[in-house]
Amino acid sequence: MAAPVVIRDLPDIGVTVVSRWVFNCYVVHDRGDGRPMVVDLGLPSQLPVVREVLRDHGQDPDDLGAVIATHGHVDHVAGLTALRPDDRVDILLPRTVEDMLAGSRALRSPGPAAMSRILPVVAEQPRDWSALGEMRPLMGRIGYDRRHIAFPRTPDGWLDDGASLPGGSDWTVVHAPGHTDDATCLYHAPTRTLISGDSVVSFEGRAWCNPEYVDAAHSASTAERLRSLPVEHLLPGHGLVVTGSDVMGEAWSHDDRPPRSGRLRALWRIAVDRAAHRHG
């Protein structure tokens, strides 16, 4: 049986989390001009839930101002395929994706060995194998990997480092390469909130500069930059929300590893759950 969609309201910062397993999507209810925006619409099935969340908050789903991706991997953009041609919503992607589409920048993506480093993160959220099944046929058809890049429509705008998001927003774009070349975060200084995409994940209540990366030097530079931001609310691309007085100051580095006991517990949970799913 599939795990239910996890919906968590964070009223102190005006955000609702919509998660299926590790596919975290964030609804920001006021981007600055009263209109909502969505960050990392990773699955097509998340869009109806996002619309329901907006209605529950007294907002018109048709007033959605933007859908933003922190980077172009399929698990952060696959939900774009659910948008209707007549949806009046801007799609915003990191500026580096423009170079990838033009062929002037190589397509780099972490390999299996690097991906295995975040398995402990995968175990912490309610497993929903059907979510993985939903995404699998979209691999290679949307977003990018090492060989392909494609999006359902031309983006309406690009995210530039240091720029504010549209709509008179207090959200600032932070280019954060390392996990990928286009990796991007969004920072909201008034609430000290960081939507980190895959630049920072979380495990056991602690931020973790992503150990799954294509460029270690860039990862180190990104970690140093993000540690300089006062962050009390971390909204990661994968993993659970982390709150605290100095979330990034206490973060693991990209070359740190959680305690072995925690990793083993996480892998055991995944193995048991997968076996139950296969025989359920």
List each model region and its residues.
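Short, structured coil segments at secondary-structure junctions
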Residues: 11, 86-87, 230
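Short catalytic-loop micro-motif centered on adjacent basic/acidic residues
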Residues: 37-40, 63-69, 173-175
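Residue-level marker for buried hydrophobic side chains located in beta-strands
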Residues: 37-39, 68, 91, 193-195, ...
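Metallo-beta-lactamase
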Residues: 42-45, 144-150, 164-251, 256
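Active-site HxH/HxHxD metal-binding segment of metal-dependent hydrolases
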Residues: 55-157
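Short internal loop-to-helix segment that lines adenine-nucleotide cofactor pockets
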Residues: 155-165
